[in-house]
Each structure stands twice: as C-alpha cells, then as structure tokens.
Amino acid sequence: MTVRTALLQGQQLLEKASVSEARLTAEVLLMRAIGHDRAWLYAHGNDELIEVWWIHFGRYLHQRIQGEPTQYITGRQEFYAREFRVTPDVLIPRPETEHLVEAALARGAEAILDIGTGSGAIAVTLALETKSRVTATDLSPAALRIARHNAQALGARVDFVACDLGAALVDGSFDLVVSNPPYVAGRDRDSLQPEVRDREPAFALFGGEDGLAIYRRLVPEARRPLRPGGWLMMELGDARAVREMCAGWGGVEIVNDLAGIPRVLIAKKP
C-alpha cells in the first residue's frame, strides 16, 4: 500500500465514523506514524508504506474513531506558534486562550503568576515572550510534570509550585495574576462534544454546576499575591457573573475575541 492510498483510506474511515476534519486528521496521524512532515507525505505519495508505519497508523485511527482527541494521540498541541506536549492529564490548550496571553503581554509585568497552569502553555509562553519572572501553580502533580517538561523542552524559565490556587506564595509578590480556570457549567455537560466531555480532565473543565465555583475562590484569593495596583486577568465563561464578582476591583474591562465573544476579564487591585 502506498502512502497516498493509506492516507485516502484513513480519511474514508474517519469520515465514516463522522470524525470532523477527516483529511487533516488522517494527515496528522500518518505524520505521527511515520515520523515525517506533511511535505514529505505528498512528495512520497507513491512510496510503499512499510508494515510498522501501517500498524502505528491503524492504531492511531482506531483511537481517534473511538473518541480519543488527536492531540492526545500525537501528544502535541500548538499554542502561540510553539508545540506543547499534552496528555490526558491536562486540558488541551485552545487558540482562544491566546487572547489571555496577548492581554498579559500588553501589561509588561515584571512578575507574573499563572494559577492552574495545566500544560504550562500560558506560563511558558509568557516566560519566552517577556523578561518577566514567571511562577505557575497547579494542584495536580501529573499536570506539573507535563508543564515542567514543556518549560524544559522550550527553554523557558518558570518556577512551578504545587499548591491550591496561590496558597503557597508570598503576599504581594506579583504584578500580574493570570488564570484560565475551569468554567464549563456542570449543567451543560451533555452539550459538550464527547471527545471533550469524556476524554479531557473533568477537574480542568467543569467549574461546578453553574461554572463559577473556581471564580468565586479565585477572585478574592488573587488579591493576596498581587501587589497594590497589580492586575488580575482571567479567561471567561459567564462574563457578566464574573464581572459582578470583581465589583471591589478597579479598571475592570472585558476583552472580546474576533467573534465578539467576551473572552478575557481584566481587573486592577486597588
């Protein structure tokens, strides 16, 4: 079987299983199986697919058809033009979270705290894009292992701390606190795609029945590690409800994404 034929058959299997973006997914999985990029696939379309490549490709196709996210199969996800390692222990970084990174970069903070770092995508990106001192926390030891791996692989200097929110950190030591907390409402669970609902870590997705449980803790807790005049930035689910929680903060603003959806809340510590 040639590379071209394998790619076509993979696409057809994925389409039959109603997997979205079947062609792209087949390409990504075949690239993973053979260890070459997309340009190689098309330059060597008439090459015979060796047996070990076909075995790997077949296994990856089966995993995807069974609902495993492509990113967990390949172990990779691009974020802010860099490739991050991801596993089922961490949430898959989304493109919309780059709006949070952009908002943080615009502040030029000297010391940044990322609460609930997960894969480390936000913290590592901020460390690489700035000269800031970056600290990141997470309660999950498995997530911290992935985050440390990503920092090391990408050459970022980030201090990782195992704790709940910012509990283990010194008061008033940061100019900026960023967070992408779990904000999917438990009542909306059934509306999620199965590959998200059933495969990504629930603790990183769901913020209680109304999606606001972590915000209720995070908004008051973020005051402590922030210096006076420091900034809190959070990715949003329910913008109106979270804005109301920040009534005691100054300079509250909402940043919309390109689709006009409220995506980031910014608030200044008095």
Can you say where each PLM-predicted feature lies in the sequence?
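C-terminal beta-strand of the catalytic ATP-binding
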Residues: 183, 268-270
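Non-catalytic accessory regions of SAM-dependent methyltransferases
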Residues: 1-41, 46
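Mobile active-site "lid"/loop adjacent to the S-adenosyl-L-methionine
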Residues: 183-214
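Conserved Class I SAM-dependent methyltransferase catalytic core
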Residues: 209-268
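Conserved AdoMet
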Residues: 28-106
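Conserved SAM/SAH cofactor-binding pocket of Class I
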Residues: 92-191, 217, 239
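Class I S-adenosylmethionine-dependent transferase superfamily signal
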Residues: 126, 196, 218-222
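Generic structural signal for residues in well-ordered beta-strands
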Residues: 84, 158-160, 252
